[in-house]
Design a protein with these regions (language model features):
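Gly/Gly-Pro-rich "capping" loops immediately C-terminal to redox-active cysteine motifs
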Residues: 35-46, 58, 62-100, 189
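The canonical Cys-X-X-Cys-His
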Residues: 45, 49-59, 107, 122, ...
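Axial heme c-ligation environment in periplasmic c-type cytochrome domains
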Residues: 63-73, 97-129
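Beta-strand-rich domains and repeat architectures in extracellular enzymes and scaffolds
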Residues: 143-205
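Repeated scaffold domains used in trafficking and secretory/extracellular systems
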Residues: 148-158, 197-203, 239-249, 288-303
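Short coil/turn segments that connect the beta-strands within blades of beta-propeller domains
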Residues: 165-166, 206-208, 253-256, 306-309
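Short loop/turn segments that connect beta-strands within beta-propeller blades
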Residues: 183-185, 224-227, 272-274, 325
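A short beta-strand motif characteristic of beta-propeller blades
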Residues: 187-192, 228-235, 276-292
Length: 325
């Protein structure tokens, strides 16, 4: 009897070691089965991900409008239990089908946008560990700043006959341009080269300038008073951006501009008529669950006309910032 009890104790003592070995082997298998990409394949996949996926799934692939696309993730549920998942668990074949045919949750199908080889490549890519992109400092922002036409060399009055109260700035997304269209005559008055995949155009309070931001983080300032409107200044505010607005409170018209980025998660305050960078502010912080988030992206920015403030919306932390300029 004593011998049997002794053997039972040994079996129980060995159980944690066996379980540890089992899970350790599973982790090793996950690492071993993760696809490998050549440098050229990785570069191509990164480009496609930036153009087609990052807007919904996030630069770090932690999920936003779309789901988390990390190889392995864990999530604590309200009842205290832990849920696990990841792209490795889904596997190559299923991932290819999801990317190709979309989901009921709202993701579009990409089988008519990407080739079969590209679908397979993206399924492999999201099973690899995401690279953390570099930061983008105030110095780098300032180094990117260009003034093509200084303020003192710009027109002192409107040099064309456009009705600036009825002018449209229309995004030409794939060519990285905007078309300035006369609302009275419906004529294209000018096509201006701007950043990649223009996301939004904002008119200044005076009606003289148009601020255009592309998804590559390039902000362009267009002067509508010129005989043929053109870019007079530009600056790169980040690697991935969506929003811009200007100061519109009485007495501050056209004085300041602000642009927000998805990556790095921050906003930049600038001189309104030159785009000279004045300040960079990070939006990293805590979510409503008290968890630190490394990628709280700047969504819409709206300028108040009743206070000297911008309303800056931050996605992942759910914060609405009132920034007094």
């Amino acid at each position: 009897m004593k011998r049997d009890q002794y053997l039972q104790v040994l079996r129980l003592a060995a159980l944690p070691l066996a379980m540890g070995a089992l899970f350790g082997t599973a982790s090793a298998q996950d690492a071993a089965t993760a696809p490998t990409l050549t440098p050229d394949e990785k570069a191509a996949a990164k480009k496609i991900y930036f153009e087609r996926c990052a807007g919904c799934h996030g630069v770090l692939r932690k999920g936003a409008t779309g789901k988390n696309l990390e190889p392995h993730w864990t999530k604590k549920l309200p009842d205290g239990s832990t849920q696990e998942g990841g792209t490795l668990k889904l596997g190559q074949n299923r991932l290819e089908k999801i990317i190709a045919y979309g989901t009921e949750g709202g993701m579009v199908n990409f089988d008519d946008i990407l080739t079969k080889d590209e679908l397979a490549l993206m399924a492999k890519y999201i099973q690899t560990t995401p690279d953390v992109p570099p930061e983008y400092s105030f110095k780098e922002t300032t180094d990117s700043w260009k003034v093509m036409v200084p303020v003192d060399q710009r027109p002192k009055k409107q040099m064309n006959n456009f009705n600036l109260k009825n002018m449209f700035s229309v995004t030409l997304r794939d060519t990285g341009e905007v078309a300035l269209i006369d609302g009275d005559t419906k004529e294209i008055r000018s096509i201006v080269k701007t950043g990649y995949a223009v996301h939004i155009s904002r008119l200044s309070a005076s009606g003289r300038y148009v601020y255009v931001i592309g998804r590559d983080g390039r902000l362009s300032l267009i002067d509508l008073w010129m005989e043929k409107p053109a870019v007079v200044a530009e600056v790169k505010v980040g690697f991935d951006a969506r929003s811009v607005d200007t100061s519109k409170f009485k007495g501050f018209e056209d004085k300041y501009a602000v642009a927000g980025s998805y990556w790095p998660p921050q906003y930049v305050i600038m001189d309104g008529d030159t785009l000279k960078p004045l300040k960079v502010v990070s939006t990293r912080g805590m979510t409503v669950d008290g968890e630190y988030h490394p990628e709280p992206r700047v969504a819409s920015i709206v300028s108040s006309q009743i206070k000297p403030e911008w309303v800056i919306n931050i996605k992942e932390t759910g914060q609405i910032l009132l920034v007094d300029y």
